[in-house]
Regions:
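N-terminal signal peptide
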Residues: 8-24
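Extracellular/periplasmic catalytic domains that process cell-envelope and extracellular macromolecules
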Residues: 56-59, 106-109, 121, 144-149, ...
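Classical eukaryotic N-terminal signal peptides for Sec-dependent ER targeting/secretion
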Residues: 1-8
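Surface-exposed ligand-recognition segments of extracellular binding domains, strongest
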Residues: 112-151
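Eukaryotic intrinsically disordered and solvent-exposed regulatory patches
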Residues: 75-76, 99-102, 140-142, 160-164
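Conserved hydrophobic ligand-interaction patch in extracellular adhesion modules
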Residues: 73-108, 113-115
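Short, structured beta-strand segments at or near domain termini in extracellular proteins/domains
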Residues: 7, 168-178
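Extracellular disulfide-stabilized recognition modules
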Residues: 23-84
Length: 178
């Protein structure tokens, strides 16, 4: 009888750990992700940010900042908003992907950078979206991606231009669009 109780408890604990402890699970819902008590990071300095302007169709101009300062995904997003009145970049075609990859490769030093996508799972269904709400109409996943137990964020590999699912708490350089 005691043994059964013990087994039941162990079962509960490991189920609990499985639920709470995996990397993707550390990420709370959407906006959150504040480390309590940690001050807001200062805006990137000029030396760690590189601005690029791309003329688009119909006279529209796209502006990007490549920030070589490693932040978690949600902090990067906040910095894009606070420091550039922008957002993490979304990518809608191959040519933009290439352009951003090349500049990110030259201007950042981690091999991967955050772009503005997140992947989440609802039971067996894994889906990705841009946090700026633009349509998810292009993707360039590396083989075996997206990977997602609960929620992951999208990183662009600066060597291949392919995208990988990364734990949102990882700290990476990032690309803002404004
Ligand atoms: C790719 O996307 C950018 C920005 O969304 C746009 O300005 C450009 O015209 C597109 N290029 C092609 C070849 O569709
Ligand atoms: C994808 O979405 C972007 C952003 O709204 C849009 O500019 C682009 O034309 C779309 N591309 C295709 C192929 O539908």
């Amino acid at each position: 009888m005691k043994l059964l109780v013990l087994l039941a408890l162990l079962g509960t604990v490991s189920a609990h750990q499985l639920h709470e402890g995996t990397p993707e699970q550390e990420v709370p819902a959407e906006q959150g992700e504040e480390e309590p008590g940690e001050p807001e990071p200062p805006c990137p300095t000029e030396s760690e940010s590189f601005r690029m302007t791309v003329p688009g169709s119909g006279g529209h101009t796209y502006r990007y900042v490549f920030v070589n300062n490693c932040q978690t995904f949600w902090r990067a997003r906040k910095l894009c908003a606070r420091c550039y009145r922008g957002r993490l970049a979304s990518i809608h075609n191959y040519s933009t992907n290439q352009r951003l990859r090349c500049t990110a490769r030259a201007r950042t030093n981690r091999g991967q950078v955050w772009i503005g996508g997140v992947t989440s799972r609802w039971f067996w269904r894994v889906s990705s979206r841009w946090i700026d709400h633009s349509p998810w109409n292009y993707s360039n996943w590396a083989r075996g991606n997206p990977r997602c137990f609960w929620k992951t964020c999208v990183a662009l590999c600066t060597a291949s231009g392919q995208w990988r699912s990364v734990r949102c708490r990882a700290r990476l350089p990032f690309i803002c669009e404004y």
